[in-house]
Amino acid sequence: MAVKIRLRRMGAKKAPFYRIIVADSRAPRDGKFIDEIGYYNPLTEPVEVKINEEKANEWLSNGAQPTEVVKRLFNNAGLTK
């Protein structure tokens, strides 16, 4: 099972809010997930990002692959693989 760290869209129409989740790569974007490790709100100024670093590092060490957007969020937050 390939595990990805990716964004799950929440919020209203034209007002997106994202949760950073760990999910099977074959699961739909807003479908079943394994764990929630944070959130990302692109509409606030400055952009609001909260990541549980302990959980994120645990999943990265277990082999979960972050998507490109999540990699960028991790780098901005100071988390590196």
Curated annotation (Swiss-Prot):
GO terms for biological process: translation. The keyword Secreted does not apply. Signal peptide: none annotated. Keywords: Ribonucleoprotein, Ribosomal protein. GO terms for cellular component: cytoplasm; small ribosomal subunit. Belongs to the bacterial ribosomal protein bS16 family. This is Small ribosomal subunit protein bS16. It comes from Clostridium beijerinckii (strain ATCC 51743 / NCIMB 8052). The gene is rpsP.
